[in-house]
């Protein structure tokens, strides 16, 4: 009798434990689910082949994302903000899918070359939020398009180049021919001609955004032909333009050779110590495109629940998102005054800057 009573009591205790265990498991599962649904906002960007250290477009975007992360006490990584670097165009789709699997709330594609990959992945993943920088994707509620009036900013550096050249020869080095770089070339050419109709403009393309050696080769040819100011819109390829200008300045400090940078202030890229022991800078100015402002701005809106999917946000002179960089030591006051004059005419609509060469 005692054995039967003990067995019955033991069975009840075991049963109670199972029930409590089941209840505990259910509670844990619910807690885990709640934790996931209430997780902090996360954001990532996929670079083009230039990478975050290209000293140009991608780097500017990454600086904007870092600023957003720090302002919101976020850490770099899958639980905060991060980037995925693309070594080749084949990596675009792979990196976007990796970002989706990592459950980022907002995923940027940095550069127009990621358009096709963003279009495909965003269609397959309609619940994820994406942004394409420097291109437009229409009729997609989970994609925001970010654009810049590059032609307006390029017009202003064209004014600087046209008024600064002593040889009446200036150059333009493009990365890859296309809609975006067309705007840089068209604006620059129009700006030069507006103030110096007799200037010759040598336009060449490297067909790559990440080949500094090609950029240096083109720059060498241009400078040898008498060009004294080169505007590059070529990402990492433009580093070669700076390298060539610095080599020439180092050998002959009296020679006037200038580079106009792009996307971010490239003043530091122009620093050089010449053979006379003195320090110089071959950066005339830079045509800034505040990708950092755009990236930070959209991330802030998305975090607040204001993701404007299906729209295009365009940044221009009116928002100081394009224009000349802060370092202007190598530009005369008279030239800067002309720049302000033409800037106001563009903002007022008195000058319509072309988008195609």
From Swiss-Prot:
InterPro entries: BMP_lipoprotein, Peripla_BP_I, PnrA-like. The keyword Protein transport does not apply. The keyword Repressor does not apply. Its main location: membrane. It is found in: Cell membrane. A lipid is attached at residue 23 (N-palmitoyl cysteine). Pfam families: Bmp. It is a lipid-anchor. A lipid is attached at residue 23 (S-diacylglycerol cysteine). GO terms for cellular component: plasma membrane. Keywords: Cell membrane, Lipoprotein, Membrane, Palmitate, Signal. Belongs to the BMP lipoprotein family. This is CD4+ T-cell-stimulating antigen. It comes from Listeria monocytogenes serovar 1/2a (strain ATCC BAA-679 / EGD-e). The lineage of its organism: Bacteria, Bacillati, Bacillota, Bacilli, Bacillales. The gene is tcsA.
